[in-house]
Amino acid sequence: MTRGLAPLLPIEFHKMGSFRRPRPRFMSSPLLSELPRFQAARQALQLSSNSAWNSVQTAVINVFKGGGLQSNELYALNESIRRLLKSELGSFITDYFQNQLLAKGLSFVEEKIKQCEGDNRIEVLAEVWDHFFTETLPTLQAIFYPVQGQELTIRQISLLGFRDLVLLKVKLGDLLLLSQSKLPSSVIQMLLILQSVHEPTGPSEGYLQLEELVKQVVSPFLGLSGDRSCSRPTHSLARRHSRVRPKVTVLNYASLMTTVGRPLNEMVLTPLTEQEGEAYLEKCGSVRRHTVANAHSDIQLLAMATMMHSGLGEESGSEDKHLLLPPTFPPPHRQCSSEPSILDSPDEMELEDVASGSQEDSELNCASLS
């Protein structure tokens, strides 16, 4: 038996060895040999990113100093930012702009304002704001056009920076109390525009300080705490005509009940959501940037207001006019005036016809001008 098995063993091992694959070599050896080439390519990419970012920094600081962009420079800056967005620095561009570039650029603006005192400082502030709002801000938006902010856009970040780093540091409130001259319209525009920018985390200390400034120059003023009064003479935006107009009192029971039943948070105007950047445009196409939703409109109130204003232009008497509007209760499911009215059954259609008929009768009987 031993003699019979002995010659079979070499044959069996020979068959197994024929199907065995050769042992693979150390796989990292080719990569180690190409490592210098990869390092050289990475260094070249970093140098390119640094060069692109340096060009962006130089252009932004030059804009804050009052300079402009050269021919075709905007296209080159946009391409540089697109390359940076694809690199490791892409997620830090917005933060670096807010914390470094914007702070450094606005420091030049603050120094220019603080060189003057008294009423001259207010005049310089108005000039600085005009240049910032008409020249600097649009240029910054154009340079950082490819950037899509996470919560705030480049425009909002720039306006918030101007509020915190320029306006609140020049102590405009003290200047307004001491100033006897007429306040420039650019300062009022600046305060109202800055008030329209809101932080995503809610009202900050800077926003509340800004509201105190707005309260000193605008009357009537409606802020987070409601209507406020001020002892200092204020500038009313609606006071444009010096001629005497008759007083008109509008009594609308539906609006009164709606106002009383609505909480304070819903009565305060909420800001529009502003989006910009290439990513947003690719997502939404040609959709408008600002959208006003749930805008309630009353056709009857609009018609009566038109008649009221047309009567004011013809009559110059000082007698009081009282306008009584009938109560209108819109259905709870109607959110917009353009929303179609869909009824489920003929009975509801009959009820609506009866309600509209009674409403027309009440309009003819209750609406009167005395």
Curated annotation (Swiss-Prot):
* UniProt PTM: Ubiquitinated. Ubiquitination by RFFL promotes proteasomal degradation of PRR5L thereby modifying the substrate-specific activity of the mTORC2 complex. Ubiquitination by RFFL is stimulated by LPA/lysophosphatidic acid.
On this chain, the residues bearing Phosphoserine are 28
Which Pfam families does this one have?
HbrB
Which Gene Ontology BP annotations are present?
cellular response to oxidative stress; negative regulation of protein phosphorylation; negative regulation of signal transduction; phosphatidylinositol 3-kinase/protein kinase B signal transduction; positive regulation of intracellular protein transport; positive regulation of mRNA catabolic process; positive regulation of phosphatidylinositol 3-kinase/protein kinase B signal transduction; regulation of fibroblast migration
Keywords from the UniProt entry? Phosphoprotein, Signal transduction inhibitor, Ubl conjugation
Residue segments, region Disordered: 327-370
Which GO CC terms are listed, alphabetically? TORC2 complex
Which GO MF term does the entry hold, naming one?
A: ubiquitin protein ligase binding
Q: Which InterPro entries match?
A: Bit61/PRR5 (IPR013745)
Instruction: Report the sequence similarity comment from the record.
Output: Belongs to the PROTOR family.
State its role.
Answer: Associates with the mTORC2 complex that regulates cellular processes including survival and organization of the cytoskeleton. Regulates the activity of the mTORC2 complex in a substrate-specific manner preventing for instance the specific phosphorylation of PKCs and thereby controlling cell migration. Plays a role in the stimulation of ZFP36-mediated mRNA decay of several ZFP36-associated mRNAs, such as TNF-alpha and GM-CSF, in response to stress. Required for ZFP36 localization to cytoplasmic stress granule (SG) and P-body (PB) in response to stress.
Self-association state and partner proteins as the record states: Interacts with the mammalian target of rapamycin complex 2 (mTORC2) which contains MTOR, MLST8, PRR5, RICTOR, MAPKAP1 and DEPTOR. Interacts with RFFL. Interacts (via C-terminus) with ZFP36 (via C-terminus); this interaction may accelerate ZFP36-mediated mRNA decay during stress. Interacts with RICTOR.
Protein name from the UniProt record: Proline-rich protein 5-like
Source organism of the structure: Rattus norvegicus (Rat)
